[in-house]
């Protein structure tokens, strides 16, 4: 692995707008940290008191707000708000193609080098942070697990319209796969793992 190539600007990837209606635009930072042992990826564990995905592992980021000039601005702002990392400690390396989630989110990932972890202070949204050596990801393939996308009638669905099957049961519409990395008791999965997998594929091709 060529660490100098990893920390140089990455090739541009085509960015396209969402093809789904009513998606929530979000942005995340994918932070690389250089230390004596090599390069690490920084992750955060979401607070267990949050209503949305409590305790999940993610990259710093969140919803793109009206005050954000660009998706990148949102990723940097959210990183500062969640981990107290100032913009001057962030050097952007690449913007990856947006990802569409089945939960109605368009996720804009930005790869960056964070020059120091001394400033990291977790806010109420973050339980704690941890790092994983980049080399570990280079040497370990993720697991693949099936997820079912399903629907059932809501409370206001008209009773005079027939619905096949038990209205209280979920009806499977589509099966898709998610990546899972297991590292020292941590389970990195879903969109976060998909972003990691894309980064590793790009780095291996450098």
Name every feature range the model reports, one short phrase each.
Residues 1-58, 63-109, 113-118, 126, ...:
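N-terminal leader/linker segments that precede catalytic domains of diphosphate-processing enzymes
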Residues 119-124, 141-142:
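Short, charged, solvent-exposed linker or helix-capping segments at domain edges/interfaces
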Residues 129-131:
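Flexible glycine-rich active-site/ligand-binding loops centered on an Asp-His dyad
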């Amino acid at each position: 692995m060529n660490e100098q190539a990893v920390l140089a600007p990455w090739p541009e990837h085509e960015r396209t707008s969402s093809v789904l209606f009513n998606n929530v635009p979000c942005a995340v930072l994918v932070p690389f940290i250089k230390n004596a042992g090599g390069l690490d990826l920084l992750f955060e564990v979401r607070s267990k008191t949050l209503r949305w995905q409590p305790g999940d592992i993610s990259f710093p980021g969140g919803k793109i707000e009206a005050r954000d000039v660009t998706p990148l601005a949102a990723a940097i702002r959210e990183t500062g708000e969640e981990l107290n990392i100032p913009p001057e400690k962030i050097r952007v390396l690449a913007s990856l193609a947006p990802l569409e989630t089945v939960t109605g989110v368009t996720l804009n990932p930005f790869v960056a080098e964070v020059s120091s972890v001394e400033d990291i202070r977790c806010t109420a949204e973050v339980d704690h942070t941890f790092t994983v050596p980049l080399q570990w990801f280079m040497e370990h393939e993720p697991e693949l697990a099936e997820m079912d996308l399903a629907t059932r009638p809501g409370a206001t669905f008209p009773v005079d319209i027939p619905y096949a099957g038990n209205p209280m049961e979920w009806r499977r519409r589509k099966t898709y796969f998610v990546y899972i990395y297991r590292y020292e008791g941590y389970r990195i999965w879903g969109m976060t793992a998909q972003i990691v997998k894309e980064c590793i594929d790009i780095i291996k091709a450098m």
